[in-house]
Curated annotation (Swiss-Prot):
This is Thiamine kinase. It comes from Escherichia coli O157:H7. The keyword Kinase applies. Transmembrane segments: none annotated. It is an enzyme of class 2 (transferase). Pathway: Cofactor biosynthesis; thiamine diphosphate biosynthesis; thiamine phosphate from thiamine: step 1/1. It catalyses: thiamine + ATP = thiamine phosphate + ADP + H(+).
Length: 274
C-alpha cells in the first residue's frame, strides 16, 4: 500500500496511525548501510525500514518498494506500506549465516530471480562512480583514482550478456535461510542489468568459490562457463571502483573509521587486478 505524503512522520506517528496494535520488538543492524526495527502483534511480524542513505533521493527508496511489490514472496519480503522515509515489509523467519550457502543453491536463487520480469529501470555504474568521486573527502582523492575513472568512462560499461532484474548486494548478511529455501533481503540497489554484473558483485570468499558459483549458474542458464566467466571479469574493475567509491563516500558522510579501512583494502585489490 503506497501512501503519498510530502510531510515526513515520526516512528511513533507511523505506528499509531498504521499499526496501532503492533509494538516494537528489537532494533537490529542490516549490514553496513543502516538499520531497521521489528514490530509484532499476536505472532505477526513486520520490518520497518528507513533509507540507508539519508542523502539519497526519495525516488531510490520508492524504487525499492516497487521492486519488492513485483517480486514473488518465495525470494523476497512482501511490502505492506510505503510513505516518505518509511517502508514496512514482511519479516522473513530463518537464519542469517556468516558465510554463503552452497554455490549451486545460490546459483539457483539468482537464476530464478533473473527469470522474473524486469523492474523497468537500468543500473548504470558510471553516474555512481562520478557521484562518489564528487562527494568524497577532497583529501582522499588521488591522481590514480581520477585516472581509473577516466579510463572506465572512455571504455564504457560492458555490453550486457543477458538483461535481467538484479539484486546487486548479494552477501551472507542479506541471505535468509528459511524453511522454504533461500531468500534475499535489502533490495535498495535493485534494478535491471547484466546477469554477469550480479555474479561479479557477489561477496565471495575466494576466486575458487567465485568460479564455482559462475559454473553452477552457467549450467542452469545454458551458457558456456568460460564465456560467462570472461563477462564476469569484465565487470571487476567497475565493481571494485564502485565499492571503493562507496566506502569513501560513506567515510565522509559518517566519519566511521571502518569505511576508511574498507576503502584502502579495496584500492589494494583494484591495483592487484589491473
Amino acid at each position: 500500500m503506497p501512501f503519498r505524503s510530502n510531510n515526513p512522520i515520526t516512528r511513533d506517528e507511523l505506528l499509531s496511525r498504521f499499526f496501532p496494535q503492533f509494538h516494537p520488538v528489537t532494533t537490529f543492524n542490516s549490514g553496513l548501510s543502516g538499520g531497521s526495527f521489528l514490530i509484532e502483534h499476536q505472532g505477526q511480524r513486520f520490518v520497518v525500514r528507513q533509507p540507508h542513505d539519508p542523502d539519497a533521493p526519495q525516488s531510490a527508496f520508492l524504487r525499492q518498494y516497487r521492486a519488492l511489490s513485483q517480486l514473488p514472496a518465495c525470494i523476497a519480503p512482501k511490502p505492506h506500506l510505503y510513505l516518505r522515509d518509511w517502508m514496512v515489509v514482511d519479516y522473513l523467519p530463518g537464519e542469517v549465516k556468516t558465510y554463503l550457502p552452497d554455490t549451486n543453491e545460490l546459483a539457483g536463487l539468482l537464476y530464478y530471480l533473473h527469470q522474473q520480469p524486469r523492474f523497468g529501470w537500468r543500473i548504470t555504474l558510471l553516474p555512481l562512480l562520478e557521484l562518489y568521486w564528487q562527494q568524497s573527502d577532497p583529501a582522499r582523492r588521488t591522481v590514480g583514482w581520477l585516472r581509473m575513472l577516466k579510463r572506465l568512462r572512455k571504455a564504457r560499461e560492458p555490453r550486457p550478456l543477458r538483461l535481467s532484474p538484479l539484486h546487486m548486494d548479494v552477501h551472507a548478511g542479506n541471505l535468509v535461510h528459511s524453511a522454504s529455501g533461500l531468500k534475499l533481503i535489502d533490495w535498495e540497489y535493485a534494478g535491471d542489468g547484466d546477469i554477469a554484473l550480479e555474479l561479479a558483485a557477489v561477496w565471495v570468499e575466494n576466486t575458487e568459490q567465485h568460479r564455482q558459483l559462475v559454473n553452477d549458474y552457467a549450467t542452469r542458464a545454458k551458457i558456456y562457463p568460460a564465456q560467462l566467466w570472461r563477462q564476469v571479469r569484465r565487470w571487476f574493475p567497475w565493481l571494485l571502483m564502485l565499492k571503493a567509491g562507496w566506502f569513501e563516500y560513506r567515510w565522509r558522510q559518517t566519519g566511521d573509521q571502518q569505511f576508511i579501512r574498507l576503502a584502502d583494502d579495496t584500492w589494494r585489490q583494484l591495483l592487484i587486478k589491473q
